[in-house]
A protein has these predicted regions:
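Conserved interdomain hinge at the start of the Helicase C-terminal
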Residues: 1-19
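Conserved catalytic network of the ASCE P-loop NTPase/AAA+ motor domain
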Residues: 7-9, 56-60, 77-79
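Conserved helicase ATPase core of P-loop NTP-dependent helicases/translocases
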Residues: 15-17, 25, 32-73
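Short, solvent-exposed loop/turn segments at secondary-structure junctions
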Residues: 20-24, 45-46, 72-73, 91-93, ...
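Alpha-helical elements of the RecA-like P-loop NTPase motor core of helicases
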Residues: 25, 29, 51, 77, ...
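Short, well-ordered beta-strand core segments
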Residues: 66, 85-86, 104
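A short beta-strand element within the Helicase C-terminal
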Residues: 77-90, 113-117
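A conserved SF2-helicase RecA2
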Residues: 92-151
Length: 151
């Protein structure tokens, strides 16, 4: 229900990252039941099909929502038709977290971006907090290297 509420309130397209294979179909089916055109991108989807889904998402009205397994689209994909990301559950990899969130943060993005984290327990909230802390540390580290290179 929370995911559908976010999609309903979003002005533009939405990406929902679902880390667990068994939950991807459940989330997509619920969104479809609630009337949202939805496509799935996971490891089970061929590269040719992914390319078509991404192209349609960027260039057409439908699909409105992509339900994505984060590892399947965390690198090399521009999805700026969306300005909202929903994390259905946290992941362990800070690199995948950063890269997945960057799918909507491109020079062609014209809208304010929103990242929403859904959690069902205090442990999941702490995992999100840890990801954000690692993200801040990684950005600080990169900044230090950049300063050193300029010196």
């Amino acid at each position: 229900d929370e995911v559908s509420e976010v999609v309903q309130e979003a002005a533009n397209k939405v990406i929902v990252f679902v880390p667990f294979k068994h939950a991807i179909d459940i989330v997509a089916d619920r969104l479809r039941k609630d009337g949202f055109s939805t496509e799935i991108v996971s490891g089970a989807v061929s590269m040719k099909a992914r390319t078509k889904i991404f192209k349609d998402f960027q260039e057409s009205d439908d699909p409105r929502v992509l339900v994505i397994q984060p590892q399947s689209a965390s690198h090399g994909v521009t999805l700026t038709a969306a300005d909202t990301i929903v994390w259905f559950a946290p992941i362990a990899s800070v690199e995948t977290w950063l890269q997945a969130n960057e799918r909507i943060n491109r020079p062609s993005q014209k809208n304010k971006m929103t990242i929403i984290k859904i959690y069902g327990s205090e442990v999941e909230k702490r995992v999100y907090d840890a990801l954000e802390s690692k993200e801040a540390n990684q950005k600080t580290l990169v900044s230090l290297y950049e300063q050193e290179l300029k010196a």
